[in-house]
């Protein structure tokens, strides 16, 4: 199984070509689809939906998003949660492409379905879930405290756990595993990772795919914190279980 990917070496593909010019690269695992995508400036993503849940983090640019009538302008480090089958759309604002990291569960593919006019007009009810999060306003929590100093913020959906985390310079993540699948993309810093004996030093825009129950560990390389976006399926939580050597 391939554990490591470089976005720069992956095929740039269209995602949602029936309703948007969204393009980028992604990895399809057993339970998660995870990738780095962008929507060109001056374009929009028409109302659409898909049976799978989706969570995204803005990397750059500004976008006006609407989820079931709940609208918000999103900028860097904002998170957008789209429940399964929620009708949503987006319009890129300004003269910069909208770049984002996204995760979906594999109950459906990367492509959505164009909404009918009736579906596009649908509004969420009073019990609608929270669709938008700003990392600067979220609690910084520990993740994996029994084996690493990993910390950050994350959103837990019905099927996906998704967040932005970091591991301090000069520290390690000791060997651990978890029953859920995990995907990681590096934002900054460098990290030497070992997944079931397969080792690689990761830098910005590298993706790691950690299968369920795979034993993995790592060490931050250099004097910069290792910052990454990660997704896990919800068959287990954010915390893993240490593995004794």
Question: Model features per residue range: what roles?
Answer:
Residues 35-49, 163-177:
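Conserved short histidine dyad/triad with adjacent acidic residue
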Residues 37, 56, 80, 165, ...:
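Conserved GNAT-family N-acetyltransferase fold
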Residues 69-84, 198-212:
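Short acidic-glycine-tyrosine-enriched beta hairpin
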Residues 44-45, 64, 80, 84-89, ...:
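Histidine-centered metal-chelating micro-motifs
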Residues 1-31, 110-159, 243-245:
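A short, N-terminal "cap"/entry segment at the start of jelly-roll beta-barrel domains
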Residues 52-63, 180-182, 186-191, 196:
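Glycine- and acidic-residue-biased ligand/ion/polar-headgroup-sensing regions
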Residues 84-109, 212-238:
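Ligand-binding loop in jelly-roll beta-barrel domains
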